[in-house]
Amino acid sequence: MSRIAYGDESIRRTGVPEPMYLLGVYIADDEQPDLADALSVYVRHAGKLHWRDHLPQTKLAVCRTISGYDASHLVVVASPLILDGGEERARQQALFCLAVHLEDKFNVHALVLERRQRSQDNKDENTIDVARRSRVLTQEFRLTHKFGRDDKRLWVPDQVVGALGDYAAGQDTGWQMIADRVL
């Protein structure tokens, strides 16, 4: 059985007690129906599904759809963020932790993250290399980057971290429907 994790991030600075960086993954299992296909019906803008673009009723419908699938999700939260920036440092710490948990607890050896600027993607790759050299990750663990419009499975973690971020900000957008599916 092949399991691949697909990851995306969210940053919350307003409406939360402390600024937070969220890095979440959807663990795709090739033996189960693909949740990303079911979420495709909610795409409003050509090419990609963004949590921040949804109307409140769509956010509830998306969470209802996610809750109907027996999929695994994992979110790492780094908080607090320093006032002037800090997102990249938080991301690298969260990525290190996330990769270790994926391999150790979920037997996942491949992670696909949404592509950002090349220099930022290089930092992700360096973080994974450090974990491999430290023997915290095996040499088999692979990290790749793809554009969200090129792989709809990247849409799933965007929805999950978006819902968690809304919940942390006191907004009722369906998090309670999916909370039991997220570790």
What are these regions (language model features)?
Residues 1-183:
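Phosphate-ester processing/binding pockets and catalytic centers
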